Amino acid sequence: MSILKLKPSCKDYLWGGHRLVEEYGKEYEGEILAETWELSCHPDGPTVIVNGPSAGKTLQQYIEENGKEVLGKNCRRFRDFPILTKFIDARENLSIQVHPDNRYALKNEGQYGKTEMWYVMDAGEDAFLYYGFQKEIGKEEFAKRIQEDTLLEVLHAVPVQKGDVLFIESGTIHAIGKDILIAEI
């Protein structure tokens, strides 16, 4: 089996920038490039093979045609390919998010949950992200803070710099701040 070269799926969310094209040579015709999904079988952005006899097929098609064995013996236990690797160029702040765990996501969304690992490829001088709560709050306070747009006041603002690595376990409230370039697994 030869090495597969993949073409990423490109995402143009409003908060994205230009660095993935200008500094990392990603091919994209749009004005804003927020994310490239480098290794993906996700239906919203599959990567496409660009070399060899499987050129033009998605990674998912390749796996279906050649069997899960091409991924190694441990992948046989997964229903779907369980990894999504992406580069994120956050020119602006991202929304606050909480991702479900596998049990909830498989039952309610039909796909795996999302625990993330971030490697900060680059960051501005005052760059930070939000990670978890400063203190425990109840459902009522949570709802009130969302309504009043004060939720950020009770989240940890974590300064980041190039080379930092962060583990974001599913169920953890988080958000990427502006002026950060991240590799996410």
What is each of the regions a protein language model found here?
Residues 116-118, 175-185:
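A short hydrophobic beta-strand segment most commonly corresponding to one strand
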Residues 14-19, 84, 155-164, 175:
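Gly/lys/ser-thr-rich phosphate-binding loops in alpha/beta enzymes
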Residues 96-99, 159-178:
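Conserved metal-binding segment of the jelly-roll/cupin
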Residues 108, 129-132, 142, 177-181:
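A short secondary-structure junction signal
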Residues 1-137:
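Transition-metal
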Residues 137-167:
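Active-site glycine-rich loop that binds ribose-phosphate moieties when present
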